[in-house]
């Protein structure tokens, strides 16, 4: 069944355009608060805070009540900011003319400046240049191809050269990081590999996984931190292919299983783990591209779709996926249920730049920004199935448009990869609100049944996502 649609007053959108930065309620087009009355340069949002950069000055606001939380009067020429995962740290990037142009502040300890660096590259080339370990006790500084690891007392733990990309990993009280790296042989040729480092001994990698020529790499880690996807990209200097060559490798840390995922010939457009950590999705191949679903252990499960797609957007509750053809494509979007694989809707949003789910997985916010075209800027809000509920065309240029999220202790936490636990949490909430909507979990897949009385909701209907299937016996591979 579809997500229940209730009061829309809590949905808020941050807009940045020529009129300034302001907050509005999109369903009623009501401006709630203005933060600047002139054009500003950037808005960045996290869970607890959002930052506005105006004339090189940085202001920090609370997402809870949009009050001014901190004005950084002593910082000038700010060009970008980045929040750590748990909003404990704020990284501020200043213009290159500043000697120490990359600064890290502890937001939970009176904005203490805990470290600062000299960045020798533009942040877009390796963004974010600063990352943190999952426990936020270690700081990674990535500059060009050099990776330095510090503790929160400014002590250098180790330094690594020839790094193309990396990710921090923590599970079962064990701390690692994975990286794509290369070495230069005596004959001048480069040898590429993926490596796993254990924090108990950073002097040498605990695993070395050889791979083919790699110019660039994208790395994604599953929610339980036990599975890693490496997208190795060869830009192909021979010019035999416009797209170059691209492969995806799967690595299981606990068993050291390392395999190349079999995909259609052509570029890899996008790939992502589902937020609940049970699957990953890959969009690959020459157009029309193929979108395939895999179990988290790397085993192929099924094809989802084939079409002019290059972007994957999975809902936070892992129940829906929007497959999009953005960028140079025509903007076609198809919406699928990840529960039964059904196509549940279609739409088109030509020239869309940003496209994101709301926290509750009910809506998606998309926008045409001036970074793509200077005219016909607009934003739209769609339901999970592509049905448009808000279309707001702007007479001028829009530079940023994003949902403003608010930290809510009562919100269902999707950082749990135990689906059974999530299902029980959902079940309790639905029973309170609808008189008995029951959700059950079977071997990692959520099935939806309604054993209570249906009551009217704002949309006046409850739409099913397909008939409930009979339970089948599963073998071990399906568990």
Each language-model region and where it sits:
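Blade-terminus and WD-like Trp-Asp/Gly-His loop motifs, strongest in beta-propeller folds
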Residues: 3-10, 41-49, 80-89, 129-138, ...
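Residue position within the beta-strands of beta-propeller blades
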Residues: 15, 52, 92, 141, ...
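Beta-propeller domains
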Residues: 211-317
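A short beta-strand motif characteristic of beta-propeller blades
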Residues: 29-35, 67-72, 112-120, 155-160, ...
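Short, conserved, GDST-rich strand-edge loop motifs in beta-rich repeat architectures
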Residues: 181-188, 231-245, 367-377
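Conserved blade-ending motifs and adjacent loop-strand segments that build the rim/top face
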Residues: 307-310, 342-356, 388-402
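Terminal intrinsically disordered, low-complexity extensions flanking WD-repeat/beta-propeller proteins
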Residues: 375-479
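Beta-propeller blade signature
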Residues: 105-106, 192-199, 244-254, 337, ...
């Amino acid at each position: 069944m579809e997500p229940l649609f209730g009061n829309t007053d809590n949905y808020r959108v941050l807009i940045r355009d020529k009129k300034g930065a302001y907050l509005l309620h999109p369903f009623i087009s009501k401006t709630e608060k203005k933060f600047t009355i002139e054009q500003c340069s950037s808005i960045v949002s996290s869970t607890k805070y959002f930052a506005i950069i105006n004339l090189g000055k940085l202001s920090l606001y609370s997402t809870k009540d949009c009050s001014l939380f901190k004005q950084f009067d002593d910082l000038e020429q700010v060009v970008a900011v980045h929040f750590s995962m748990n909003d404990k740290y704020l990284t501020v990037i200043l213009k290159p003319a500043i000697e120490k142009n990359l600064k890290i502040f502890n937001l939970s300890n009176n904005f203490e400046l805990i470290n600062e660096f000299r960045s020798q590259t533009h942040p877009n080339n390796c963004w974010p240049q600063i990352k943190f370990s999952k426990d936020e006790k270690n700081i990674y500084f990535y500059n060009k191809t050099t990776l330095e690891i510090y503790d929160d007392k400014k002590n250098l733990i180790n330094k690594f050269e020839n790094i193309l990309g990396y990710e921090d990993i923590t599970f079962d009280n064990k701390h690692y990081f994975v990286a794509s790296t290369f070495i230069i042989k005596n004959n001048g040729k480069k040898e590429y590999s993926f490596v796993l480092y254990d924090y108990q001994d950073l002097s040498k990698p605990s695993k070395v996984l050889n791979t083919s020529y790699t110019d660039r790499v994208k790395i994604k880690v599953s929610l339980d931190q036990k599975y890693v996807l490496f997208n190795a990209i060869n830009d192909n200097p021979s010019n035999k292919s416009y797209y170059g060559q691209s492969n995806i490798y799967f690595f299981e840390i606990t068993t050291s299983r390392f395999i190349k995922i079999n995909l259609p010939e052509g570029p890899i457009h996008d790939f992502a783990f589902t937020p609940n950590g049970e699957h990953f999705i890959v969009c690959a191949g020459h157009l029309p591209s193929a979108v395939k679903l895999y179990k988290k252990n790397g085993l192929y499960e099924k094809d989802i779709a084939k079409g002019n797609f290059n972007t994957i957007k999975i809902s936070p509750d892992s129940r829906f996926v929007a497959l999009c053809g953005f960028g140079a494509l025509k903007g076609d979007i198809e919406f699928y249920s990840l529960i039964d694989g059904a196509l549940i809707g279609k739409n088109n949003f030509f020239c869309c730049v940003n496209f994101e789910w709301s926290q509750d997985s009910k809506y998606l916010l998309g926008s045409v920004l001036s970074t793509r075209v200077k005219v016909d800027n607009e934003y739209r809000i769609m339901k999970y199935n592509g049905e448009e509920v808000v279309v707001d065309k702007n007479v001028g240029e829009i530079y940023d448009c994003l949902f403003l999220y608010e930290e809510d202790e009562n919100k269902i936490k999707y950082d749990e990869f135990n689906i059974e636990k999530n299902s029980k949490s959902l079940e309790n909430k639905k029973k309170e609100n609808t008189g008995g909507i029951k959700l059950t979990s079977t071997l990692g897949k959520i099935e939806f049944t309604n054993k209570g009385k249906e009551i009217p909701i704002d949309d006046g209907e409850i739409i099913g996502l397909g008939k409930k299937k009979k339970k089948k016996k599963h073998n071990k591979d399906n568990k």
